[in-house]
Amino acid sequence: MEAYKMFAFVVLLATTLYQAYATDPTQLQDFCVGVNKPNDGLFVNGLFCKDPMEVNPDDFLFRGLNMPANTDNALGFAATLVTAANLPGLNTLGISVARLDFAPHGLNPPHTHPRATEVFVVLEGTFYVGFVTSNLADGGNKLFAKVLNKGDVFVFPQGLIHFQLNIGNYPGVGISGLSSQNPGVITIANAVFGPEHLSQLMFLLRPSISMRIWSSFFRIGSQVVAATTSMCS
């Protein structure tokens, strides 16, 4: 009986360990098509590793988050990103960071990070922030939003549409921590309505989504769709 219990325990333990470690790594690109020969590949899911004997402290250092970015644009917003691309020591560590600068009433428009959760920390200013859930059982979506002040922290779950609006009359600054060395970003308006080939009458939308689809979906005329694309160029 004791031998049977021990056997059952070992089987259960082995099954648990298998389930714990038999998971795919987090993707760091939109896709990574496999090749049989390494010399046929142009990208890897991550970066090749530097010889440890050649690593130095500068590989783990980035300078510049003390400098505000230029917010003189239509949105009144700019981001300074720190990822494995400009801080090589982040490679494989699963994190990145960004400084977000806002002009008065500046907006980081609705967007998603397909590969990362974001933690937003307010350094200066007053913000209205929020995220929208994925489709619920009733087909709707729920908004979670708050007003944040200096020192407040808000989290945006991975892949969900979210935004940050500076509702103050002064510039605002925030720091965002992201749970991927390459979180990716999809700005909703640009992805859906941004024109790619204005000369193509029926394929004005990036990435070439038929105008008929959007006219039917939003129940608006093609002229309204075309006007919207022109504002997202």
From Swiss-Prot:
Span of domain Cupin type-1: 63-215
Keyword Disulfide bond: yes
Source species, domain of life: Eukaryota
SUPFAM superfamilies: RmlC-like cupins (SSF51182)
Cysteine pairings via disulfide bonds: 32-49
GO molecular function, one term: manganese ion binding
Listed PANTHER family: GERMIN-LIKE PROTEIN SUBFAMILY 3 MEMBER 3
Protein name: Germin-like protein
Native source organism of the sequence: Mesembryanthemum crystallinum
Lineage of the organism: Eukaryota, Viridiplantae, Streptophyta, Embryophyta, Tracheophyta
